[in-house]
C-alpha cells in the first residue's frame, strides 16, 4: 500500500528537519515508548478509527518500509510489542520464502512464536551455536539457508543430533533469502523515530513529510475534503495493482497520509523550503 523503498537520504533529511522543528533529537527517543510501539499493531494512539481511514487499522501510514498489503497483514497478525519484535517482523516482511507457507503457518499451529521464529539470518547462526553446533558448521549452514540453497543431509543429521526440532529444519528448507539483522535494526530505528514524531508532533511531522515530497504531491487534487479523499483512494484501489501507474501509486500513498492528517484535526499543509 505504502512504500518508500530503502533507507535513503529522504528519511535522513526528514528526521533532521523534525529535529530542527521540534527541538527533540532523534537519538534521545526511547525505544520503549508504549504509545509509539502501539502504532505497529493498532491505530488507537492516533485517536482515529480504522473505518475512517478506509479500514487501515495500523498507525504506520507514511513510514518507510510499510509498503504492501502483505506487510500490513504481517504486522497485523504478529502484533509486535517491543522494538526487538519490530526488528523481527521486518525480517519476515523483507525475506523471501519466510512468511507465507512458512512462519505464518508455524505460528498459527502454535509450533513457534515470534520470538522463536526464524526472521533474520542471525537468528539461525545464534540458535545453532546455542544448541551446541560448531561455529564454523553453523555459519556454513546459515550461509546456505539465507541464500536459498537449503540444508544438506549431513547438516540435517547434525541439526537433529543437537535436538533441533523438525519444524525448525523444515522452516530452513523453505527459505529463499534472508536479510541480516543489522539491516532490519536500521530500518526499525528510523520507523520508530518517525513514529514518535508522528504521534507527538503531528503538525511538524506532516509538514516535513510533504516538504520532502513536494515534487510528487498534487496539492490541487489532494487538498480536498475527507469524502473526496476516500473516493480517490477507493478509485485507485479498484485498479488492479499491475495496471496502476507510478502516478497512481504516488497519489494513493499521499491520499492516505492527507486523509490521516485531516482525521487528526490538521487542515493545512505547510511546506519547508530546501
Predicted features along the sequence, with ranges:
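Noncatalytic, beta-rich nucleic-acid-contacting surfaces in large DNA/RNA-processing enzymes
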Residues: 1-274
Amino acid at each position: 500500500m505504502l512504500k518508500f523503498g530503502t533507507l535513503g537520504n529522504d528519511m535522513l533529511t526528514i528526521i533532521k528537519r523534525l529535529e530542527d522543528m521540534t527541538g527533540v533529537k532523534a537519538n534521545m527517543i526511547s525505544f520503549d515508548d508504549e504509545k509509539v510501539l502501539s502504532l505497529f499493531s493498532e491505530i488507537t494512539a492516533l485517536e482515529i478509527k480504522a473505518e475512517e481511514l478506509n479500514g487501515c487499522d495500523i498507525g504506520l501510514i507514511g513510514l518507510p518500509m510499510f509498503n504492501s498489503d502483505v506487510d500490513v497483514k504481517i504486522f497485523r497478525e504478529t502484533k509486535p510489542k517491543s522494538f526487538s519484535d519490530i526488528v523481527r517482523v521486518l525480517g519476515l516482511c523483507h525475506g523471501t520464502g519466510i512468511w507465507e507457507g512458512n512462519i505464518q503457518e508455524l505460528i498459527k499451529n502454535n509450533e513457534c512464536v515470534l520470538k522463536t521464529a526464524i526472521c533474520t539470518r542471525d537468528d539461525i547462526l545464534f540458535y545453532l551455536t546455542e544448541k551446541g553446533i560448531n561455529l564454523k558448521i553453523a555459519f556454513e549452514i546459515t550461509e546456505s539457508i539465507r541464500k536459498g540453497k537449503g540444508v544438506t543431509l549431513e547438516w540435517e543429521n547434525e541439526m537433529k543430533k543437537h535436538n533441533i526440532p523438525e519444524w525448525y529444519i523444515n522452516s530452513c528448507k523453505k527459505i529463499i533469502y534472508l536479510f541480516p539483522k543489522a539491516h532490519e535494526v536500521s530500518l526499525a530505528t528510523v520507523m520508530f523515530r518517525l513514529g514518535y514524531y508522528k504521534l507527538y508532533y503531528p503538525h511538524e511531522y506532516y509538514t516535513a513529510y510533504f516538504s520532502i515530497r513536494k515534487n510528487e504531491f498534487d496539492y490541487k487534487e489532494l487538498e480536498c475534503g475527507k469524502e473526496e479523499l476516500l473516493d480517490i483512494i477507493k478509485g485507485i484501489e479498484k485498479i488492479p495493482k499491475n495496471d496502476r501507474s507510478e502516478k497512481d501509486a504516488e497519489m494513493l500513498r499521499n491520499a492516505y497520509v492527507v486523509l490521516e492528517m485531516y482525521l487528526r484535526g490538521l487542515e493545512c499543509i505547510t511546506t519547508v523550503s530546501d
